[in-house]
Each structure stands twice: as C-alpha cells, then as structure tokens.
C-alpha cells in the first residue's frame, strides 16, 4: 500500500499528500522537532495547534530513514503491523488466544486500516496507543485487592495513567476516558472502594505527571493553562455554524483571518463562544447536523471525494459490512460479558457521541474499529468454530 500511494502521488506533481491539510501540518511540525526549532507552524506562529505525539513519531522516523516521504511511509506501515499485534494481545487478554488471532487477521486484511496506516495522519498511531491503554486497563481490572497483589495493583494503576496520557498526546479527545475509567474502577470494586480509590489516584497521578511538560510548555508560550490544543475552538465551530453540513470546511478560518488581531488563545476562545452561541440559537439545525454526522460516521465507505472510486468503495465495504454483522452477533452471544462489551464497544460509541458535535467521517471511527474487531472475532468464532467443535464432539460420541 505504501508503494501504491507513493507512486500515485509521484504521478501527480501538484499533490504532495492524499489528505492535504492535516498531513502537511503534521509533516512540518515533525521537521521542526527534527531540526530542534520552535514547535510551531504558519504565520503568525501557531504554537499550540497540534498535540505533539504524532509529530514526534514522524520526527523519529525521519531521524532514521531521512525526510523522504516513501521511507517514512514504510516506517508507518510497520506501525500498522504493530497494531495487528496489539489487537491480538487485547483479544487474548479479553477472551482467549483464538479470538486474538482472528481479530488480528481481520485487522490485517482491512483495506481502510492498511490504507490509513501509510498516510501522514494520526489515526493508526492513535489506534496503537489507544489499544495499549485499553490492554493495561484490562490487566488492571483483573488484579485482585489482596495484600499480595498490592504491588501489581500499584504498578498497573500507574501504567494505566501513563498509557492513557500517551494516547492523549496523539489524540486529545481521549482525555475523557480518564474520568470514565476512574468512575468504573471505583464503582465496580464492591467491598474494596478504598483500595480502588487509591488505584484511581495513582492512575490520575501517572496521567498528570505525563501531562506536566506539555502544560508547562503551553503556559510558557501562551500565559494560559492549556492542557490540550488551541484548535478545539475552530474545530467546534467547523461542526456548528450556519454553513455546517457535517463535513469539514475550514474556509471560514482563512476568510476571517482573526489571528490578525487576536492571539492564538483568544482565537480559540472566540470560535468556541461562537459555536456555543450558534448551537443555542439554532437547535433545529444542530439536531439535523447530528443526524448527518451520525450517518457520515457509520457510513461503510469513505465520505471524501477522492475516495469515491467504485473499487475503493467496494474494497472498504466488503470488509466493514460483514465485520459489523459479526460484531453485532458477537455482542449478542457476549451480552453478559460486561468488560468485553465495554472495551470493544466503548471506544466506537464514545467517538460516535463526540462527533455528533464535531465534524464526522470514517477517519474518526477508524481507530475505534480496532477494538471492535475483537467483538467481530467473537461472532466469527461462535458462528463457525464453536459449531465445528460441537459437530466433532457429536461425531466423537
């Protein structure tokens, strides 16, 4: 896929990236990191535009293979391979090794996952870090509260906070998982609430310690407490404005050019207030937008114009639709397995809700599909392998 993508772009001199805006920003920030320059792009400087997780990964790849696009794509392809392995680990931890292998195989043959893995976009990197954080949380949930497990509980609590923070550094929308994890951890620990609260504190401590460098750096450049980025406001307005359709269209940002008279922090506040004001005054349009965004999020094939070729639509749909059917069946046969359902369905529902407000597309669903494929693997296993085992047992008898 990396070879195909690079050859297609090489034949179109006017194009540098498959998806221009975000990819160009990530690439330029990575170059700034590699050269030891200020973490900012554009004029006037945008110092808190993106979380540094993915640019750091790109910069690391550049330091090994150089700044050529094809070499970096090959490194990102290896990250896609790593995603298969982490899905295997999570599936094995949640159910068994067979489920892990089936889920990893589904990920390996997914055209969308393979295709996005070689683009200069953060989806695959976030998927890997998100899956690792989910794996650590599952490991933590299985640690007993006895005295002999105190060290193990402490270790996995801190690791859970650290892994959540690493995923957050790639995609800031993962931030809300921390309070959700704390609530679930405490309320699921019947008879051990105090110990669970201690673990929750350690998780928050691990997360906070990881966040300190970014928050401190942002305070230095903005004189404000900024735990995420200063792009949330324009992103929110992109999804809630008079011309909004559910698709991203940031043309208003260039047309209005508010950075000419505002700081980056003031600009973020300005668009946040405008988006909230518009939502309050136009609930009907907001409700219709939610429907459009929900449709874009769950659409089996990509929404973007450049991906509307028949073979692309077919390649993505022929995998996604059956996988979703197996996931529904897997959810039914696992309806009493609350941890499994939480880890596999939780992320895809979580991002679906977030993108009822922000703009929506397959891109934002894709990272959550990785854990969902574990539920699909459960459905496949119960539909085929379980029945095969039962038939062999009957024949044996």
Show where each model-derived region lies:
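Loop-to-helix entry region of an early transmembrane alpha helix in multi-pass inner-membrane enzymes
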Residues: 45-60, 64-85, 104, 116, ...
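Transmembrane-helix signature of polytopic, membrane-embedded enzymes
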Residues: 70, 87-109, 127-128, 148-149, ...
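Membrane-interface anchor segments at the N-terminal boundary of transmembrane helices
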Residues: 71, 271, 278-344
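Transmembrane-helix motifs of polytopic, lipid-linked glycan transferases
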Residues: 74-95, 128, 132-136, 325-329
